Regions:
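Adenine nucleotide-associated cytosolic modules
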Residues: 1-159
Length: 159
């Protein structure tokens, strides 16, 4: 598993991401490596403290078969989607769009967009619409993404 992030754990992450208060200020990749190794000391992990850009995306992600996108920023999501679909034809992309707010969790779903692009979320809600991100909807969208990754590994490509 390859983990890539440039950000540090902030108090606003604790209610919806898998970090602990003792990890505040740590780089997210380092904190997540620690947490995953507590769960499974045999896991193979590669961590990069980096911001994914047009210039480095292919290099950073070339070792992955499946790319699971978890950006906050819509422009970054679009950049990664465009890069993977246009320059990495052997990769699957599982992305997320629309998990903010207090809408029903039943609106979150996963769609197969192309033979190697899956999109999880409600495709409508936006963090700027008011209430922001709430843990249950974020967790459900992440679970959709994780399950889609497992299905791709199992060669079950339909949703």
């Amino acid at each position: 598993m390859i983990l890539i992030d440039f950000d540090r754990v902030d108090i606003t992450n604790l209610h919806r991401q898998q970090y602990k208060a003792t990890q505040l200020g740590m780089y997210k990749t380092e904190a997540l490596v620690d947490n995953l190794r507590e769960i499974n000391p045999y896991i193979e992990l590669e961590a990069h403290i980096a911001r994914i850009t047009d210039d480095n995306a292919v290099t950073l992600l070339q070792g992955s078969d499946i790319i699971c996108e978890a950006f906050d920023d819509a422009e970054c999501k679009a950049m990664l989607t465009n890069t993977v679909l246009s320059e990495m034809s052997d990769k699957y992309l599982v992305a997320a769009s629309g998990m903010a707010g207090m809408g029903t969790v039943n609106s979150i779903r996963t769609r197969k967009i192309t033979s190697r692009f899956y999109l999880s979320g409600d495709e409508a809600s936006d963090v700027s619409d008011g209430i922001g991100l709430v843990a249950p909807r974020v967790a459900l969208c992440a679970a959709h993404q994780a399950h889609t990754v497992l299905r791709i590994i199992a060669k079950q490509f339909e949703v």
